[in-house]
Amino acid sequence: STGIMAIAYAQLKKHLGISGGEIRVYDYGQQLAEIEKEILDLFEVDVVDMNNSFVGIEPGKWKEWILKDGTKSLMPAAFYPEKINGKFAIRDHTGRVALEMPENSLYFDSVNPPLENIKSINDINSYQWNYFSDEELRLMEKKAKYLYENTEYAVMTGFGGNMLEGPQELRGWMNYMSDLALGDNYVDELLGKFFEVYLTNLKMLLQSVGKYIQLIQMGDDMGTQANPIISPDLYRDKIKPYHKKLYRYIQENSDVFVF
């Protein structure tokens, strides 16, 4: 996803003298805020995320949440953090604690990688991979169609396709980086499975919203503040082939631009 942290967004509104509206945190892991139409118009923004609840047809359901600086905000209604050992914790679709927010942190960290102790290819295949449901696809189509027919914005949807960042969450940072460097622990099979899942979801997504959107946001965290996370040679060998296939599929099967 791409955006601005909710605390920073609240400070921006204060700086601009805007006291009304709401702070809606659509990405609670990174604590990213949706941008209100008043702000979009102020900065003459001409593109909008398909899921922006301030502009689109589906406002969604929200619940109150206090940010770490005391700012009142709204979280998705499905946001159910637990307090475990002094930390806020969130479970994923498999029931494991996947995210934790320490007391002194401003966002959630990924924890408890489910494939940390991978023993065989069967561990990869038996993991509960997350595919779009028919209900999710229908809702996305409804949102994209509304924005396409009723606004002047270019419509963007986020997808990701993270071939470096995604496996890091399932294997753990240290494990996966070692796997890439050494070629161990079924790293090629894991990358292949991620690509398979991404491509399946990508095909369904484009079939549902491809005629209504103009941009699709792909992504991967490939660098630090100072350097690439992995060497260019390792990227070309392990990651780039999958990026290339995903981006090429979009280009060859839709009129959507890759961002």
Model-identified regions with their sequence ranges:
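Active-site loop segments of alpha/beta catalytic cores
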Residues: S1-K14, G21-V25, M101-S105, D109-F259
